């Protein structure tokens, strides 16, 4: 007997998360490791749990996520977007709640490219008048 699964994909900066929601007790597994082990900072743990807390479904679903690329903050944001998108597939009535909180919006901010003649994206070499 196959269990019901809901999928959601999230991206943030260079991170990509493929999230799977299954009915369960509230376990969150990221890259085959528990949430507490993968994200050690409390702010990142909270970021991942935000959509579940807002919709009061934290103890109703098990979350399995595969995330790659980027840093920890980008990965946490990607997982959050993936969870929110999967929750909308579970129950479409959650959409306005998640939309109002901004959890269904893909954050478009990316790292700015480095320009030639500059040291970084905007940092110029020291200017000497004489």
Curated annotation (Swiss-Prot):
What GO cellular component is one of the record's annotations?
Answer: cytosolic small ribosomal subunit
Gene3D superfamilies per UniProt: 3.30.230.10
Instruction: State the source organism's domain of life.
Output: Bacteria
InterPro entries reported for this sequence: Ribosomal_Su5_D2-typ_SF (IPR020568), Ribosomal_uS9 (IPR000754), Ribosomal_uS9_bac/plastid (IPR023035), Ribosomal_uS9_CS (IPR020574), Ribsml_uS5_D2-typ_fold_subgr (IPR014721)
**One MF term in the entry's GO annotations:** structural constituent of ribosome
- List, alphabetically, the Pfam families matched: Ribosomal_S9
Biological process annotations from GO: translation
Provide this UniProt record's keywords sorted from A to Z: Ribonucleoprotein, Ribosomal protein
Residue ranges of region Disordered? 111-130
Keyword flag Ribosomal protein: yes
Q: Which family does it belong to?
A: Belongs to the universal ribosomal protein uS9 family.
- Protein name (Swiss-Prot/TrEMBL): Small ribosomal subunit protein uS9
What is the phylogenetic placement of the source species in the record? Bacteria, Bacillati, Bacillota, Clostridia, Thermoanaerobacterales
């Amino acid at each position: 007997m196959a269990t019901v699964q809901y999928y959601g994909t999230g991206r943030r900066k260079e991170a990509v998360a493929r999230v799977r929601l299954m009915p369960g007790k509230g376990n969150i597994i990221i890259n085959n490791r528990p949430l507490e082990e993968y994200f050690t900072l409390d702010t990142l743990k909270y970021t991942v749990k935000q959509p579940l807390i807002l919709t009061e479904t934290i103890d109703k679903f098990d979350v399995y996520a595969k995330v790659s690329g980027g840093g920890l903050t980008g990965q946490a944001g990607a997982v959050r977007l993936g969870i929110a998108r999967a929750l909308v597939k579970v129950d479409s009535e959650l959409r306005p709640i998640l939309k109002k909180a901004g959890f269904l919006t893909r954050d478009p901010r990316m790292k700015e490219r480095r320009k030639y003649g500059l040291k970084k994206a905007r940092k110029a070499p020291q200017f000497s008048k004489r």
